From Swiss-Prot:
<comment type="similarity">
    <text>Belongs to the parvalbumin family.</text>
</comment>
<keyword id="KW-0514">Muscle protein</keyword>
<keyword id="KW-0106">Calcium</keyword>
<protein>
    <recommendedName>
        <fullName>Parvalbumin beta</fullName>
    </recommendedName>
</protein>
<feature type="binding site">
    <location>
        <position position="62"/>
    </location>
    <ligand>
        <name>Ca(2+) 1</name>
    </ligand>
</feature>
<feature type="binding site">
    <location>
        <position position="57"/>
    </location>
    <ligand>
        <name>Ca(2+) 1</name>
    </ligand>
</feature>
<dbReference type="InterPro" id="IPR008080">
    <property type="entry name" value="Parvalbumin"/>
</dbReference>
<feature type="binding site">
    <location>
        <position position="55"/>
    </location>
    <ligand>
        <name>Ca(2+) 1</name>
    </ligand>
</feature>
<dbReference type="InterPro" id="IPR002048">
    <property type="entry name" value="EF_hand_dom"/>
</dbReference>
<dbReference type="GO" id="GO:0005737">
    <property type="term" value="C:cytoplasm"/>
</dbReference>
<feature type="binding site">
    <location>
        <position position="92"/>
    </location>
    <ligand>
        <name>Ca(2+) 2</name>
    </ligand>
</feature>
<keyword id="KW-0677">Repeat</keyword>
<comment type="function">
    <text>In muscle, parvalbumin is thought to be involved in relaxation after contraction. It binds two calcium ions.</text>
</comment>
<dbReference type="InterPro" id="IPR018247">
    <property type="entry name" value="EF_Hand_1_Ca_BS"/>
</dbReference>
<dbReference type="InterPro" id="IPR011992">
    <property type="entry name" value="EF-hand-dom_pair"/>
</dbReference>
<feature type="domain" description="EF-hand 1">
    <location>
        <begin position="38"/>
        <end position="73"/>
    </location>
</feature>
<feature type="binding site">
    <location>
        <position position="51"/>
    </location>
    <ligand>
        <name>Ca(2+) 1</name>
    </ligand>
</feature>
């Protein structure tokens, strides 16, 4: 799981900060969890966990379940949050986020 690569207290704090629907902000989440400080290699390992169907991309269905990769009991992202997250990360406009796009998004 992703949580093994991050400090538990940081993950808990980040999840607490986005419990309410439409309160998820990927930049804040990446900062609070410590993801923003990870190396590209570590981010690639995390990407592979998030890419649940192993397609080489994170699609909207996987983004919707994003928080559950950090804690099984976390909520799903709303449609608005998922669309905003996808738009922020999908720099080539193909409707999904590749590993390079994910690394850039986390470090942005």
């Amino acid at each position: 799981a992703v949580a093994k690569l991050l400090a538990a207290a940081d993950v808990t704090a980040a999840l607490e900060g986005c419990k309410a629907d439409d309160s998820f902000n990927h930049k804040v989440f990446f900062q609070k969890t410590g993801l923003a400080k990870k190396s590209n290699e570590e981010l690639e390992a995390i990407f592979k966990i998030l890419d649940q169907d192993k397609s080489g991309f994170i699609e909207d269905e996987e983004l919707e379940l994003f928080l559950q990769n950090f804690s099984a009991g976390a909520r799903t992202l709303t449609k608005t949050e998922t669309e905003t997250f996808l738009k922020a990360g999908d720099s080539d406009g193909d409707g999904k986020i590749g590993v390079d796009e994910f690394q850039k998004l986390v470090k942005a």
